[in-house]
């Protein structure tokens, strides 16, 4: 088994354990949605998840996807990313990281810059706020969109 598959399986097991601790029933559909989110690095919308899973789960609906995403978000295993009027996107990676977003196609790419972790501590120290989180986005044009323009 490849290291990536082992990692996906491990993260799936951890997510299922978190759901069980929260008293959430584990269904094949829930497992499939989580597995898709873990394996996908594209920050999919609920519709994209539906399109990917509906061939294997013909009875699944977009409403089912949204309901499960809401449960996952409330437990803390998924983050909802909202950008303007566009559909929400969902990110399995809930650790502090940042996003670069293409202004043309909406593609979102993760990146981590450790020095930015200090921003919360500094903001808390200077303002005396109890800082709970922060969000940073960088916008630009992705390579694929730049190549199309040329």
Swiss-Prot record:
It is found in: Cytoplasm. One of its GO terms (molecular function) is transcription cis-regulatory region binding. Keywords: Cytoplasm, DNA-binding, Manganese, Metal-binding, Repressor, Transcription, Transcription regulation, Zinc. The keyword Transcription applies. The keyword Cytoplasm applies. InterPro entries: FUR, Fur_C, WH-like_DNA-bd_sf, WH_DNA-bd_sf. Residues 1-84 are annotated as: DNA-binding. Signal peptide: none annotated. One of its GO terms (cellular component) is cytoplasm. Zn(2+) binds at residues 102, 105, 142, 145. One of its GO terms (biological process) is regulation of secondary metabolite biosynthetic process. Manganese-dependent repressor that controls a regulon of oxidative stress resistance and iron-storage proteins. May act as a hydrogen peroxide and organic hydroperoxide sensor. Belongs to the Fur family. This is Peroxide-responsive repressor PerR.
